[in-house]
C-alpha cells in the first residue's frame, strides 16, 4: 500500500453535491490525482434541508439520513476510484467531513452535528474512514470551525506576503496569513452562497446564479442591505462560526416582509452585496492591502468577484488556481489532509482560529476491517 494516497470528501452548507478527491501527499504540495462530484438526489436534499431546522420526528429522520448520506458518500468514493484507475488497496484512508445539519457551538453546552455514517462509508468502500473532525475542538471550548485555516497555512502561507484565503461556499470564511505563523487567524464572515442560491432557486428554479448574471441585472436596495447587515453575527468578535441555523430561507422571509415592492432581481443583487460587504468589512479589519485568493463555488461568480474587488481596492484579487490549487477542490483536499494529520498523530486545529484551549488531534478512525 502507498502511504501517501488519501481521499477527501466534502459536502458544505450549499448541499450542491459531494466533492471527492484523491490526493497524493508524497510531495511538498498536495498532488491532485482525481476528482469527482456526486450529485445529491432531490429526496435527500429536501430531507437534509428539513433537518437543518427544528421540526417533528427529528431523531428518526436523522438516523435514516445518517445512513443514506453515508451510502451517498461511499458511492462518491467508489465512482472516484473507478474513474482514476487506482485500486482501493492503495488508499490509506478517507477523510470525510460529513454533512452538517446543526452547528450550535455558542450554547451553554455547545455542539455540532455532521451526518454521513462513517461506518457505512467504510463498509461500502472497503477503506478506513477518518471522520468526526469538529467535535474534539468543541470539547476543548472551541467553535469546531473553521478547520481549513490550518490547511491554508500549511500550503498557502509565504513568509514575506500578507495573504487572505477566502472560501466562499454556502458560508464564507477567511484565513489571514500575515507572513507570521503565530498571527494566523480565521473565521466565518457570514453567508456566502446560501442565500443567493436559495433565492434564485425559489424565484427562478435555478440551482445557482451563473456568473452572478441575475444579480447584475438588478439594483441593490440600500435600506434592505443595511437591515440585513444589522444581524448581530456581523458585530461578533472572532473566533466565530455560523451556518444555516442563522442564515436561512426562513430568516430571509422575515427580513423581506416590508420589502414586497422590490423586484426579484433587486433582491438577488442585495443578497449578493450582503455576502460581499460582510466579507470585505471583516477583511478590512485585518488589513487594507495584500493578496486575496478566493476558493469555493463563489470563485466562479464573476459579479461577486467584481464587487469584492471594488470594495477591496488595496488587494490583488484572484483565485487559488494561481497558487496551484483548483478553487473548486480546496475544501475536499483539506479533509484529505485532515485525515493525513490524524493518521500521523498530529494536531490539526488552530486555537487562535477556533478558540479551543489547545491544539488537538482531530477525528476518529473507523476501520474497514
Swiss-Prot record:
Name assigned to this protein: Anhydro-N-acetylmuramic acid kinase
Keyword tags: ATP-binding, Carbohydrate metabolism, Kinase, Nucleotide-binding, Transferase
Source domain of life: Bacteria
InterPro entries registered for this protein in UniProt: Anhydro_N_Ac-Mur_kinase, ATPase_NBD
Biological source species: Shewanella amazonensis (strain ATCC BAA-1098 / SB2B)
GO BP annotations, alphabetical order: 1,6-anhydro-N-acetyl-beta-muramic acid catabolic process; amino sugar metabolic process; peptidoglycan turnover
Role summary: Catalyzes the specific phosphorylation of 1,6-anhydro-N-acetylmuramic acid (anhMurNAc) with the simultaneous cleavage of the 1,6-anhydro ring, generating MurNAc-6-P. Is required for the utilization of anhMurNAc either imported from the medium or derived from its own cell wall murein, and thus plays a role in cell wall recycling.
Entry keyword annotation includes Manganese: no
GO molecular function: ATP binding; kinase activity; phosphotransferase activity, alcohol group as acceptor
Pathway in which the depicted protein is active: Amino-sugar metabolism; 1,6-anhydro-N-acetylmuramate degradation; Cell wall biogenesis; peptidoglycan recycling
HAMAP family: AnhMurNAc_kinase
Residues the record lists as binding ATP: 12-19
Catalytic activity: 1,6-anhydro-N-acetyl-beta-muramate + ATP + H2O = N-acetyl-D-muramate 6-phosphate + ADP + H(+)
Similarity section: Belongs to the anhydro-N-acetylmuramic acid kinase family.
Pfam families: AnmK (PF03702)
EC number: 2.7.1.170
Enzyme class at the top of the EC tree: transferase
